[in-house]
Amino acid sequence: MEENNLIKSGEILISHPPHIWKGFSTPKIMYIVLAVLFLPAGAAVYYFGLHALWIILASTITAILVEFAIRKLRKKRFSLDGSAAITGLLLALTLPPRMPVWMVVIGSAFAIAIAKEAFGGLGYNIFNPALAGRAFLAICFPVMMTEWYMPGNFSADAVTSATPLSESYIYEGTRASLYKDMFFGNIAGSIGETSALILIIGGIILISLKLIDWRIPIIYIGTVAAGAVILGQDAIFQVLAGGLMIGAFFMATDYVTSPVTPLGRSIFALGAGLITLVIRRFGAMPEGVCFAILIMNAFTPLIDKYVRPRPFGYVKKSAKPVNEKANS
């Protein structure tokens, strides 16, 4: 290994963060998460056709190539640790099914170059890169980012449809059949967020392997559900609709951009849930998961500062030394 990619501490060389001990190395964790993400990726291609595959490939390959180029320009070691591939794949799963490939490339390049590498690379980024890329695309291409198609509409003249969270969404059928379609994925939306079932299965796998903290998705989803009840909304609808499932299980649980303690993660998830509710209920956009998580990413250092447990032997600055107290 090159020393410029390591932090030297005495005689010990420590790799860059995240320093998470789960019995797996960081690359192994990344590749397990990547393998789990193949579940919603496969569902995306099944529901939305071949163009969804091009979106996934374009975003993932761009992320890897951009990270490779930047690392080489900075004369730092490039590692195929899987983090760039995860960023590219997650970004792709949050995009509309007809997103032009060139826009996908721009968003993926932004996610890696600006949201990740500009901060120093893996372990140093403040914001979730995939969500930062999605937010960038939403600002630059707002019309294209809100064009949705029902699964199966693969023809060139397919008509756009509203997502369930949109006020213009009209469902012809019973509430139970709507829940069923939202649970299995037969609704309009981003290519990787429509099937709650697939995302829940993926989340359970990660929790069972102890690769993510169960507190974040459970508290996040629970906050949205409880808040919906308080606001007089349909809790089941609010939980199944939009990007809540993919955000709770795969975005908010990011090691680097979420707090390090259980209490901190609980506060983080609660805040994300409340912000999601506020944006959905009072904001100009029907969906609030992306910006809710990004806002809480910004609060992560503050949460860690005040929630992180004090080390053994900690003494307040204002405290007097023991010998001084004895002499007084």
Feature locations, PLM:
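Long hydrophobic alpha-helical segments that form multi-pass transmembrane helix bundles
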Residues: 124-200
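N-terminal signal-anchor module of multipass membrane proteins
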Residues: 1-64, 324-328
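Loop-to-transmembrane alpha-helix initiation sites
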Residues: 126, 130, 237-244, 265-268, ...
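Alpha-helical transmembrane segments in multi-pass membrane proteins
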Residues: 32-40, 55-67, 83-88, 92, ...
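Structural signature of hydrophobic alpha-helical transmembrane segments
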Residues: 49-61, 98-107, 182, 186-196, ...
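Hydrophobic alpha-helical transmembrane segments in multi-pass integral membrane proteins
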Residues: 99-100, 143-150, 231-238, 274-289
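Membrane-interface helix-loop-helix junctions at boundaries between adjacent transmembrane segments
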Residues: 84, 89-157
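C-terminal ends of transmembrane helices
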Residues: 65-76, 112-124, 199-209, 249-258
